[in-house]
Amino acid sequence: MKIGVLSQFPELYSTRRLVEACESRGHEAWVINPINCYMNINSVKPSIHLEGEEVPMFDAIIPRIHASVTFYGCAVVRQFEMMGVFAANDSISIARSRDKLRALQLLSRKGIGMPVTGFANKPNNIPDLINMVGGAPLVIKLLEGTQGIGVVLAETRKAAESVIEAFLGLKANIMVQEYIKEANGSDIRCFVVGDKVVAAMRRQGPEGDFRSNLHLGGSAEPVKITPQERKSAVAAAKAMGLVVAGVDILRSARGPLVLEVNSAPGIEGIEQATGIKVAEPIVEYIEKVVAARRANHQVIA
């Protein structure tokens, strides 16, 4: 097969591992920067171009769309979909997961456990918003934040009111979440491919920081997840429509709570923490889907 890896960063570990996994299984891998692509949108032969030339027809693409370019990146993925290319994470699923509020609403609709979350637009709603999530301490998150940036722990009601007022004064979209004290600054990252959790690690925030993101200096170790945690992770990915997902879960007194569903989960951290190769299962999944699509096409023909 010819597989395109859509990434702005060919030198990144995640990109290199995906290329390696494709090639080790006998496939041709191309790294394409989606931001440098441009599209010919027509009803006869839609195409994608790069540096004056038409991009070759791929059997499948693996999107690694950075959060800062979600809109354009999703447009490129959608163009590939229009051309009949299988996307391991389609444009709709990526867009769903990137909208943090919409993602939580989808999880809520499916009955998947998550922290109680409030969302408001007016300063006069702040007192009720704080009560909604059980009072302080509570967590305040910028909807546009990534990798732990724009996440604040307000330890008192007064601090919460001040931070929320400041964000709303800046016209920033924020959500307020209950603080899960028993998680003790750690979470579990489940790496989901299809309907399986292929690896899981426990991430612990640095001393004095409740955020467990590895980019912020957190540590990671392999973890054995419970059947309920496994079920929640797969269900959360499915709720977004994602084939490949990093699902972040908190262990709470009332069971697993899904914090976030990531459509382009990092590969380096989880492979190094667990010793499990997660890039290969992605390629194996693609092989099965493309083979089934070809068989179906032959039957129809």
Curated annotation (Swiss-Prot):
Any one Gene Ontology molecular-function term assigned to this protein's record: ribosomal S6-glutamic acid ligase activity
EC number: 6.3.2.-
GO biological processes: protein modification process; SOS response; translation
Binding site for Mn(2+) 1: 248, 260
Binding residues annotated for Mg(2+) 1, in chain numbering: 248, 260
Leading EC class: ligase
Protein name from the UniProt record: Probable alpha-L-glutamate ligase 2
Annotated organism of origin: Shewanella amazonensis (strain ATCC BAA-1098 / SB2B)
